[in-house]
Amino acid sequence: VVLSMIPGKVFRRFKNVHAQNLVQTSISGASYAAANAMILPIGIPVLMGRPDLLIPVLIGVTLATIVDGFLIYKVFDSPMFAATNPFPSGIATSETILALANRGKRSLLLFVGMGAGVAGKALGIPMDLFGVSWFGNVVAMLAFAVGSIVKGSLIPAWTAAVSVDGVVPTMITYLPHGAMIGAGLVSLVQAALVLSKKGKKIQEDTTSERTVSMNSMRKSLGLGFALYLGIALLLALITGIYSEMSVGKLVVWIVFAAFAAIASELVCGLSAMHSGWFPAMATALIFLMIGIMMGFPHMSLGILVAYTAATGPAFTDMAT
């Protein structure tokens, strides 16, 4: 956008608002994918006392992010991930691009807001939250405010009054996690139901406007699962966790890690498509608990969580 304001023939092409929107979308998807799918997961082995595994895990989650991008391209506007469903539409970004393109009062107000943001941040004011609350839905912001007050003030006061041993506060702390896990399981069941539909049922539920058919989507997900199997095997080898397990348990871990990776995509993708939010932490927690019950060793569980945490958020952030 700034380049488009520079006089000259070379910079004229940047005046196209569609080009600006495409560039911004690419930058946004890449930024979120890098943060959620690459930088965040590599902290897990470090927190577990194995900083030497940072680079191997980074290699694995980077490959997983690339597969995520491939699958987004292949399944978007399919019966499961329809383009007509309410993905977050990025209205704020579009309005910003239009304001700068049209110049005038709206453009001036935008620069005033930018100046206020810089000044407020320099003074230590959380201007990013202020900006979000300004153009956010008033009902959603009110619900968030009430929830913050209840969690920060009322619940601690109540639990301190009724609990001496600290059991009640601990239980209440885990209630939101339980709610997210339940929501994640529902999304997984929804994905399974859509994938299990056959023949005439699919034709009744879909329209000719879909650019990706159910069969094509299934083939893409099958290819994605195969790629995730390969990445899981690579992770097991370069991180050394294969030495902690027997051959049989290693095979089970690889298959389970690939399933967790693609299931995380489906759960987070469906949640984001319908609500604009996704239970990435809950999804990773679900597969962590299942992995614990399956008896996987300590470090292999950490690699599993890092792998799972890389796929769902990347798929969702790049799609939205």
Residue ranges and their predicted role:
Residues V1-T320:
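Alpha-helical multipass membrane-protein architecture
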